[in-house]
């Protein structure tokens, strides 16, 4: 018998996470469920019927043993108020996974940017070297739907998920970076920083914190943990060589007193990916993988879709899909990594637009702005870079490709780094990225076919 036997549990939020929680707990406990969005309730009803769907005003929400909250639900929501008023604990799907897998190792990664790539890279390194780690969490696979693992889990955790965990404890925690984000959910930066720092809660002297000390907010957390002396600390940097820690400087990995050449990988370009590599290297060493094996695995890593994803090249034009770059800070990382850029950007703009990218406009050959942000972005870029206002991404791509073909520069890059959310023209950033991939592959394929047909002329 476990802690949840015969308990009454409410599941609030019926997206991917809520559905995974329901499938985990059904037939074991007395459940009720709800979501504010009718579309989500309709999907649940189609899958499982409407018997358990219970509106919040129903008194059963006041008589629960626990509420499992989906991470997208703000902590100011009425369901949270009900839980607090009636002393009902709120837990998360991450806690449920931890409870049933306590004998396994948990590696968790958080940060404003780079989480998914780092989680995938760590998993790739470990699994390429005879271990069995499953990657899940905010990366797109709900924790409770992740395949069973023999050795452990690599979890990408957002601040929203960290807000909810109560018992989850990790062997290795990674803090990549912190920059302003989600300030519509948190009162100020201090609230956002505090949420990120929760990744280190409940860790002990046998646990490791891997922290980017180049980032001001992360460095403050590192210094606080250093004073407390409760866990083992491994700092990393991509701006200076550390005597005790991991550094990547001048295309070399510095591991305390050892130095290795940084492997070349087109899928891991840019300073931001050096941070991801440094963190992944540190974690892999902690788990017990030899340095040489780590470097080999870094070389063979294939990037995640929509995250600075190299699609291919034709006629000295390379295509990069960074559809996941939904804000300027994220887009800036891919822009820093390339030159002679034909830049596709647009959608629903975030606060500040692309102002933060202006110092790097010299890397952009021409910009193609589309969607709701097109006029705003063009006003920021005018008189600095050549730009075109477009109706949609496909039109922007076609004009950009035509311009790149007529450019005699030796190396050219067509980059989708939207700096916006996608919801004005797409369901999500994945759909946006898939269109870019399709357009890129069509161009690469047709050019390859033409070049081969000319052999027979």
From Swiss-Prot:
<protein>
    <recommendedName>
        <fullName>UDP-N-acetylmuramoylalanine--D-glutamate ligase</fullName>
        <ecNumber>6.3.2.9</ecNumber>
    </recommendedName>
</protein>
<keyword id="KW-0573">Peptidoglycan synthesis</keyword>
<feature type="binding site">
    <location>
        <begin position="111"/>
        <end position="117"/>
    </location>
    <ligand>
        <name>ATP</name>
    </ligand>
</feature>
<dbReference type="GO" id="GO:0008764">
    <property type="term" value="F:UDP-N-acetylmuramoylalanine-D-glutamate ligase activity"/>
</dbReference>
<dbReference type="Pfam" id="PF08245">
    <property type="entry name" value="Mur_ligase_M"/>
</dbReference>
<dbReference type="InterPro" id="IPR005762">
    <property type="entry name" value="MurD"/>
</dbReference>
<dbReference type="GO" id="GO:0009252">
    <property type="term" value="P:peptidoglycan biosynthetic process"/>
</dbReference>
<dbReference type="GO" id="GO:0004326">
    <property type="term" value="F:tetrahydrofolylpolyglutamate synthase activity"/>
</dbReference>
<dbReference type="InterPro" id="IPR036565">
    <property type="entry name" value="Mur-like_cat_sf"/>
</dbReference>
<keyword id="KW-0067">ATP-binding</keyword>
<dbReference type="InterPro" id="IPR036615">
    <property type="entry name" value="Mur_ligase_C_dom_sf"/>
</dbReference>
<comment type="similarity">
    <text>Belongs to the MurCDEF family.</text>
</comment>
<keyword id="KW-0961">Cell wall biogenesis/degradation</keyword>
<dbReference type="GO" id="GO:0005524">
    <property type="term" value="F:ATP binding"/>
</dbReference>
<keyword id="KW-0547">Nucleotide-binding</keyword>
<keyword id="KW-0132">Cell division</keyword>
<keyword id="KW-0963">Cytoplasm</keyword>
<comment type="pathway">
    <text>Cell wall biogenesis; peptidoglycan biosynthesis.</text>
</comment>
<comment type="function">
    <text>Cell wall formation. Catalyzes the addition of glutamate to the nucleotide precursor UDP-N-acetylmuramoyl-L-alanine (UMA).</text>
</comment>
<dbReference type="GO" id="GO:0051301">
    <property type="term" value="P:cell division"/>
</dbReference>
<dbReference type="GO" id="GO:0071555">
    <property type="term" value="P:cell wall organization"/>
</dbReference>
<dbReference type="Pfam" id="PF21799">
    <property type="entry name" value="MurD-like_N"/>
</dbReference>
<keyword id="KW-0133">Cell shape</keyword>
<dbReference type="GO" id="GO:0008360">
    <property type="term" value="P:regulation of cell shape"/>
</dbReference>
<dbReference type="GO" id="GO:0005737">
    <property type="term" value="C:cytoplasm"/>
</dbReference>
<dbReference type="InterPro" id="IPR013221">
    <property type="entry name" value="Mur_ligase_cen"/>
</dbReference>
<keyword id="KW-0436">Ligase</keyword>
<dbReference type="InterPro" id="IPR018109">
    <property type="entry name" value="Folylpolyglutamate_synth_CS"/>
</dbReference>
<keyword id="KW-0131">Cell cycle</keyword>
